[in-house]
From Swiss-Prot:
GO CC annotation terms, alphabetical: cytoplasm
Lineage, broadest ranks: Archaea, Methanobacteriati, Methanobacteriota, Methanomada group, Methanococci
Designated name of the protein: Probable transaldolase
Catalysis: reaction(s): D-sedoheptulose 7-phosphate + D-glyceraldehyde 3-phosphate = D-erythrose 4-phosphate + beta-D-fructose 6-phosphate
Enzyme class label: transferase
Organism of provenance: Methanocaldococcus jannaschii (strain ATCC 43067 / DSM 2661 / JAL-1 / JCM 10045 / NBRC 100440) (Methanococcus jannaschii)
Pathway assigned in UniProt: Carbohydrate degradation; pentose phosphate pathway; D-glyceraldehyde 3-phosphate and beta-D-fructose 6-phosphate from D-ribose 5-phosphate and D-xylulose 5-phosphate (non-oxidative stage): step 2/3
Length: 217
């Protein structure tokens, strides 16, 4: 399974890219706004750091506006992917962009039927949101399970990006289910390294080694 980093912070992306963990990046207007920089400038810089797909979201809500923005964004780099909201106008834009060879990531997906519609429109990626479903009492990972099963049933090539990831458990379950990608904030990616027994074991090894050195004196 691929790991995407869900952030527009260039320093965070560099840090995890150096560890070989960043297969791609997803951004949205909120994340870019936090950086206080020009939108296009930030996206272009991220594309230069990461070889994999970099998702940048359109602001327009009508199909014509989305397509216009998408074409401009696509000029920034070859690895740009256009994030399009799961709406009727969004699917119209996806169909047009797909025909032009521009990759798309359909976002704000909350049901298997939405994921199926996005795939039929020609989406390269689809982003079901698990955390937000958990927030309202649903089981977010059940959505991922259903989407993966449907895509497998019909040999659909659209890749599933598990989004709205809140903790490492989401990443683990996504991998077990067979999702293609999990996109996560830096705080979650950082926790993938951790286990209390690892810390205890390392501390014990170091203590034993220190005692061994003392015994050799």
């Amino acid at each position: 399974m691929k790991f995407f980093l869900d952030t527009a912070n260039v320093e965070e992306i560099k840090k995890y890219a150096e560890l070989g963990l960043v297969d791609g990046v997803t951004t949205n207007p909120t994340l870019v706004a936090k950086e206080g920089r020009d939108f296009y400038e930030v996206v272009k810089e991220i594309c230069e750091i990461v070889e994999g797909p970099v998702s940048a979201e359109v602001i327009s809500t009508d199909a014509e506006g989305m397509v216009k923005e998408a074409r401009e964004l696509a000029k920034l780099a070859d690895n740009i992917v256009i994030k399009i909201p799961m709406t009727k106008d969004g699917m119209k834009a996806v169909k047009i962009l797909s025909a032009e060879g521009i990759k798309t990531n359909v976002t704000l997906v909350f049901s298997p039927l939405q994921a199926l519609v996005a795939a039929k429109a020609g989406a390269t990626y689809v982003s079901p949101f698990v955390g937000r479903l958990d927030d309202i009492g649903h089981v977010g990972m059940k959505l991922i399970e259903d989407v993966v099963k449907i895509y497998k049933n019909y040999d659909i090539k659209t890749e599933v990006i598990v989004a709205s990831v809140r903790h490492p458990w989401h990443v683990l379950e996504a991998a077990k289910i067979g999702a293609d990608i999990a996109t996560m904030p830096p705080a979650v990616m950082d926790k993938l390294f951790n286990h209390p027994l690892t810390d205890i074991g390392l501390e014990r090894f170091l203590k034993d080694w220190d005692e061994y050195l003392k015994s050799r004196k």
